UniProtKB/Swiss-Prot annotation:
Gene Ontology terms describing biological process: 'de novo' pyrimidine nucleobase biosynthetic process; 'de novo' UMP biosynthetic process; amino acid metabolic process
Protein name (database record): Aspartate carbamoyltransferase catalytic subunit
NCBIfam families linked: asp_carb_tr, PRK00856.1
Gene it is expressed from: pyrB
Residues reported to bind carbamoyl phosphate: R55, T56, R105, H134, Q137, G267, P268
Key words of the record: Pyrimidine biosynthesis, Transferase
Entry's family note: Belongs to the aspartate/ornithine carbamoyltransferase superfamily. ATCase family.
Amino acid sequence: MKHLISIADLNKSEILGLMDEADRFAEALEGREMKKLPTLRGRTIFTLFYENSTRTRSSFETAGKWMSADVINISASSSSVKKGESLRDTALTLKAVGADAIIMRHPSSGAARQVAGWLDDTAIINAGDGSNQHPTQALLDATTMRNRIGEISGKKVVIVGDILHSRVARSNAQLLTTLGAEVVFVAPPTLVPLGIEHWGAEPDSVRVSYDFDSEIADADVVMMLRVQAERMHGGFFPSHREYATRYGLSQARAERMKEGAIIMHPGPMLRGMEINYDVADAPQTVVLNQVTAGVHVRMAVLFTLLVGEEG
């Protein structure tokens, strides 16, 4: 692996290898008063974010620092991008100052792959490109699932919400079906994109339902997605109240889930919209477990790209 741009670039063995590596990092750090490993000492990592982020950016920064790398954060709003500098010139500048890896988030689909083409010898990690891909989110979601409910093969994962604008949904569909899960998307018709049947590892390996209540009782995982109003131009549903009634995870719906099933959300959560306030804090909700797994998964990705077989 030279870059991590899309889940589609990984085979099953590589996916499981990253998940296993993440678990090893979790074990290595468990019980340590000082969470510091020498793994990436002397390496320089840049985070280059053209969109806002809390979880992903802080998670990558923590992952790099826990492995003793120098991590430098670049925000588009406070860099020469604000003066009109192109993405290519920004990327070449970071390479020239010694970047071993660039972790980037960009509003345009395909931006990370383009940068990887320009900087072949610098590791590029896609932290989200438009509505296209978010590979480390899918890896941490799968790691969280496996740690809570066991092997993913044969499990039913119901992903509910704004599928149209969700890079998380796309990446999860590819990863989970590669590992043998059944993936069901639930959303209003206006938030289901064309070509969704091709999102899985094989044609027609995912399906769409418009009835949340008919899918929840036998689900092993219910993953709620935020309505991305910032990417919407025009009305996609009549009202927030109607959306919450038909597609929100209410207390009543959560109570219909089978024993041992878990609730996930990539964040940020809109409490009262796609998820009930109390459900968001319920024991079966593993949002904070996802955040914790995110650090270990991103440590695994950085280690694999920057050390690999050297380690």
